[in-house]
Amino acid sequence: MRVSIICAVVLAAVPLVASAQNQNAGRNLAASCAMCHGTDGRGATGYQPLAGMAKDELVRKLDGFRSGATPATVMHQISKGYTDQEIQLIAGYFSAQKK
């Protein structure tokens, strides 16, 4: 009985740890965006704010930059450096930030 309870508690905590790790990974990846978009994604003057943007919308934009379908200056080069999973993490981080 005790072992079952301990196992249940440990297994219940696993998603929380994974979620925290993803959030930290997203924040770490998003740090490279800070120069133009700010550390919190609110955007430096003249740059689009990313904070609070829908995750799917941001993923589409980054994919468009990466493929060259969306016009940009430096975002083509920057976005090509990220995997699909990293783009998901970055988009998740910025979508969770307050506008």
Segments predicted by a language model, with ranges:
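Bacterial N-terminal signal peptides
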Residues: 4-15
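Electrostatic cytochrome c docking/interface patches
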Residues: 13-30, 46-48, 59, 64, ...
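Residue-level hotspots at or immediately adjacent to binding/recognition sites across diverse folds
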Residues: 20-21, 39, 78, 93-95
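The canonical Cys-X-X-Cys-His
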Residues: 33-39, 90
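Gly/Gly-Pro-rich "capping" loops immediately C-terminal to redox-active cysteine motifs
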Residues: 40-70, 76-80
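C-terminal capping alpha-helices of c-type cytochrome domains
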Residues: 67, 80-99
